[in-house]
């Protein structure tokens, strides 16, 4: 009799096997065997990715494969799938519970218990992720507290991009709506951790009033968010249409004076000619001077 007893349940501990020999309808004697069932190592590799500069091919962020075992009686042998021969090649000097992968591919670890000689293998796949390189922001609906910022990433990379406004919650959409006037920070990342880009964006608006009384608070009237690229010209008028002041859009603003003299508290009108997304635009409105 020559047979192999296989324990398919993987029950740990001691197992009793009863073996009865038979020949035709004739049964022989029964022999009992006590077999010790040792636990198998249970490596648990997790699929991951490496970050690679697409233009240079250089890996700038490796991925650490972890067998997630710490038994001092375990040894580790690491392999990588050779896609030409479809066999696993041993990775030299890779004998720890972790391995730092710098190339994409399928990896395998064989863990051996040196006391019981039980061994188990596990595999994981490591893929390449190329980062996004840069992005541009387009602001529409200026002069409102309901502006829209649209983000365009180029090159987009291969990661799953997410977007954040002013350090707020991450979102999958590249469009932010209802954005208030002022300076904002846009952050673009990917969920794989290969991309991290930031940029400041200005949303244009104007203060509805100012109080030029020298207390350092709202002493100047100035349009918020204008930059040199807007090529803006700002004109301030009184209620009769008389030009009071032309102000520098990048300067401090208007101090509430005409020819060096304070002028009355009342409403004043302004006109701003500017460029938004390569289109010439004009905006008119009024604000209050309060003393």
Region annotations inferred by a language model:
Residues 55-70, 145-155, 219-224:
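A short beta-strand segment in extracellular, disulfide-stabilized domains
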Residues 1-16, 95-107, 174-183, 252-253:
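Solvent-exposed segments in extracellular or luminal domains encompassing
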Residues 24-30, 114-123, 168-170, 191-200, ...:
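Short, exposed coil/turn segments at beta-strand boundaries within extracellular/luminal domains
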Residues 68-82, 86, 156-167, 230:
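Solvent-exposed loop segments of extracellular immunoglobulin-like
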Residues 40-48, 131-138, 204-208:
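Proline-enriched interdomain boundary motifs that mark the N-terminal boundary
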């Amino acid at each position: 009799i020559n047979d192999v007893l296989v324990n398919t349940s993987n029950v740990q501990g001691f197992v009793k096997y009863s073996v009865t020999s038979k020949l035709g309808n004739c049964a022989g004697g029964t022999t009992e065997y006590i077999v010790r069932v040792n636990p198998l190592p249970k490596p648990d590799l997790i699929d991951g990715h490496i970050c690679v500069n697409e233009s240079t091919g250089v890996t700038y962020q490796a991925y650490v494969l972890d067998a997630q075992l710490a038994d001092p009686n375990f040894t580790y042998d690491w392999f990588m799938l050779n896609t030409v021969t479809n066999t696993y090649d041993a990775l030299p000097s890779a004998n720890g519970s972790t391995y730092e992968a710098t190339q994409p591919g399928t990896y395998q670890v064989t863990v051996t218990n040196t006391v019981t000689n039980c061994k188990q293998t596990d595999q994981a796949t490591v893929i390449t992720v190329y980062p996004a390189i840069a992005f541009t922001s387009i602001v529409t609906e200026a002069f409102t507290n309901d502006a829209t910022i649209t983000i365009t990433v180029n090159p987009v990379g291969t990661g799953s991009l997410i977007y954040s406004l002013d350090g707020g919650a991450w979102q999958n959409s590249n469009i932010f709506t209802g954005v208030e006037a002022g300076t904002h920070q846009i952050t673009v990342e990917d969920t794989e951790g290969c991309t991290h880009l930031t940029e400041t964006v200005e949303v244009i608006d104007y203060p509805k009033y100012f109080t030029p009384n020298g207390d350092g608070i709202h002493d100047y009237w100035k349009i918020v968010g204008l930059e040199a690229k807007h090529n803006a010209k700002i004109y301030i008028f009184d209620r009769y249409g008389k030009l009071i002041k032309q102000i520098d859009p990048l300067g401090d603003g208007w101090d509430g004076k005409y020819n060096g003299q304070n002028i009355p508290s009342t409403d004043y009108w302004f006109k701003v000619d500017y460029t938004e997304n390569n289109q010439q635009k004009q905006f008119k409105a009024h604000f209050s001077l309060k003393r």
